[in-house]
From Swiss-Prot:
SUPFAM superfamilies: Retroviral matrix proteins, SH2 domain, SH3-domain. This is P47(GAG-CRK) protein. Keywords: Host-virus interaction, Oncogene, SH2 domain, SH3 domain, Viral budding, Viral budding via the host ESCRT complexes, Viral release from host cell. The keyword Transmembrane helix does not apply. Residues 248-354 form the SH2 domain. The lineage of its organism: Viruses, Riboviria, Pararnavirae, Artverviricota, Revtraviricetes. Residues 438-440 are annotated as: Gag second part.
């Protein structure tokens, strides 16, 4: 325990500065996490897989008991761990040795020289050293984690050669972009196949978020689960009137039109529409984490049976209607929206309905301000709203709703969102401009 406290304290002093928590506060937090069964060992805190469950549990505890001390400490510790991870300085036993003054090389970000890795890695926990091979460590990585090169040992990370390799001159991998995710989210915890899709149950699996690669609709977190939003933002409750159905219900709106209305809007902007494939059901479409997510809302009768379609949300009738989203049941759509004003769907709460003025308008660059970019890497696209492209493609920028994600159009007239780190601004030839502007 003491060794882990020293490591975490040193990391916090490096990345948090004067706001760094004390060793006493870190120790109290670790004791609580072990008591609650969130950590089998204090050193498990180094694993990114433990961060989301810890955040969810401490957030729920703070809101239920009004005790936010451990949550505040965890926020600082998490920030330090994420900062180290983003700089490719993951908390390993080698870095622990460095911080504790026990020797060992400090993890360095990849440079132009040959990138290397150690043959073995050891973890320090209560004086015990446990050997772990590189192959074993790589096999334990989560599917969404990115195996980034790091320099610690004496053999090349890619080919294993001690000297004389040419890996340093190989093509660099595409840069990371906002939304790709450095560690798995809680969005997929407890999900079952067929839950939360805009297709009949069992037709497709729900996706865990940008970068997961699955298509279809999503399932929100369960009751009481409060998922940490991107960037650690505080819980924000919506100010809209859930009883004003005209502000959020759009009727028979297609999925594509919903994406067009919500793409680029602030997190938490939403609308409710009729399901296009399951009559009588609805879809909650929400702008969150640089994408548009779609959550299926099943309509149930008094005995749990399916309701006939065409009645609209909460339409009066002889039999009361209930609404199922994920594993939560509500008496009406307004009560469902009220619930998600203060509970996270995945990374956001419901903040406001999309404005009706968006229906016939769009924010598009004026002709004299049109910009073009050239693709530096291939991009396959992870969401329905993404625009796939190949290295060397010329794209026309239509608008810039976010700093790291722009809305673009390719030479075939297809439109969608592109990651800014994957492209560079350019001045295409007149022939390319003619093609992109419709002169084909």
């Amino acid at each position: 325990m003491e060794a882990v406290i020293k490591v975490i304290s040193s990391a916090c002093k490096t990345y948090c500065g004067k706001t760094s928590p004390s060793k006493k506060e870190i120790g109290a937090m670790l004791s609580l996490l072990q008591k609650e069964g969130l950590l089998m060992s204090p050193s498990d805190l180094y694993s990114p897989r433990s961060w989301d469950p810890i955040t969810a549990a401490l957030t729920q505890r703070a809101m239920e008991l009004g005790k936010s001390g451990e949550l505040k400490t965890w926020g600082l510790v998490l920030g330090a761990l994420e900062a180290a991870r983003e700089e490719q300085e993951q908390v390993t036993s080698e870095q622990a040795k460095f911080w504790l003054g026990l020797g060992g090389g400090r993890v360095s970000p990849p440079g132009p020289e040959c990138i290397e890795k150690p043959a073995t890695e050891r973890r320090i926990d209560k004086g015990e050293e446990v050997g772990e091979t590189t192959v074993q460590r790589d096999a334990k990585m989560a599917p969404e984690e990115t195996a980034t090169p790091k320099t610690v040992g004496t053999s090349c990370y890619y080919c294993g050669a001690a000297i004389g390799c040419n890996c340093a001159t190989a093509s660099a991998p595409p840069p990371p972009y906002v939304g790709s995710g450095l560690y798995p989210s809680l969005a997929g915890v407890g999900e079952q196949q067929g839950q939360g899709g805009d297709t009949p149950r069992g037709a497709e699996q729900p996706r865990a978020g940008r970068g997961a690669g699955h298509r279809g609709l999503r399932r929100p977190a369960g009751r009481g689960q409060r998922v940490r939003p991107a960037g650690g933002a505080a819980l924000m409750a919506g100010q809209f009137d859930s009883e004003d159905r005209g502000s959020w219900y759009w009727g028979r709106l297609s999925r594509g039109d919903a994406v067009s209305l919500l793409q680029g809007q602030r997190h938490g902007t939403f609308l409710v529409r009729d399901s296009g494939s399951i009559p009588g059901d609805f879809v909650l479409s929400v702008s969150e984490s640089s994408r548009v997510s779609h959550y299926i809302v099943n309509s149930l009768g008094p005995a749990g049976g399916r309701r006939a379609g065409g009645e609209g949300p909460g339409a009066p009738g002889l039999n009361p209607t209930r609404f199922l989203i994920g594993d939560q049941v509500f008496d009406s759509l307004p009560s469902l929206l009220e619930f998600y004003k203060i509970h996270y769907l995945d990374t956001t709460t419901l903040i406001e309905p999309v404005s009706r003025s968006r229906q016939n308008s769009g924010v598009i660059l004026r002709q004299e301000e049109v910009e073009y970019v050239r693709a530096l890497f291939d991009f396959k696209g992870n969401d329905d709203g993404d625009l796939p492209f190949k290295k060397g493609d010329i794209l026309k920028i239509r608008d810039k709703p976010e700093e790291q994600w722009w809305n673009a159009e390719d030479m075939d007239g297809k439109r969608g969102m592109i990651p800014v780190p994957y492209v560079e601004k350019c001045r295409p030839s007149s022939a390319s401009v003619s093609t992109l502007t419709g002169g084909r």
